[in-house]
Amino acid sequence: ARRKRAATHPPVATAVVAAILGLKDRKGSSMVAIKKYLAANYNVDVARLGPFIRRFVRKAVAEGMLVQNKGSFRVNKTALPKKKKAAKKPKAKKVKKPKSAAKKKTNRARAPKTKKNRN
């Protein structure tokens, strides 16, 4: 049995969604435009991938991931998995040394100065 070679392109589902997002057509991208995009950017034989592309598009429309408008398809933004924001690492709080309590000046009752006799 021959070993299966790893594909040089991403999975069809990923590539089609990337194509639709990359084309940025307001009303959606046609199947022809999607195939042209895949051929140009992923260097694949679109004639061979045609059935896989059609199957994915039908499945994605049924699941609500893509929205079909006549012959065009656009990505349903609400159905896309949201990218998780990288969890922010809590910053190590600098341990503040408590300031030494300011010494309160105490007004001591001082003994009145006595005049020295200079005799």
UniProtKB/Swiss-Prot annotation:
Boundaries of every H15 domain copy: 8-77
Main location: nucleus
Keyword Disulfide bond part of the UniProt annotation: no
Renumbered residue ranges of the record's region Disordered: 76-119
Ranges of biased composition (kind: Basic residues): 80-119
InterPro entries registered for this protein in UniProt: Histone_H1/H5_H15 (IPR005818), WH-like_DNA-bd_sf (IPR036388), WH_DNA-bd_sf (IPR036390)
GO molecular function: double-stranded DNA binding; nucleosomal DNA binding
GO biological process, one term: nucleosome assembly
One Pfam family hit: Linker_histone
Compartment(s): Nucleus; Chromosome
GO cellular component: nucleosome; nucleus
Keywords attached to this entry: Chromosome, DNA-binding, Nucleus
Protein family (similarity comment): Belongs to the histone H1/H5 family.
PANTHER family noted in UniProt: H15 DOMAIN-CONTAINING PROTEIN-RELATED (PTHR11467:SF20), HISTONE H1 (PTHR11467)
UniProt function note: Histones H1 are necessary for the condensation of nucleosome chains into higher-order structures.
Name this polypeptide is given: Histone H1B, sperm
Source species of the chain: Platynereis dumerilii (Dumeril's clam worm)
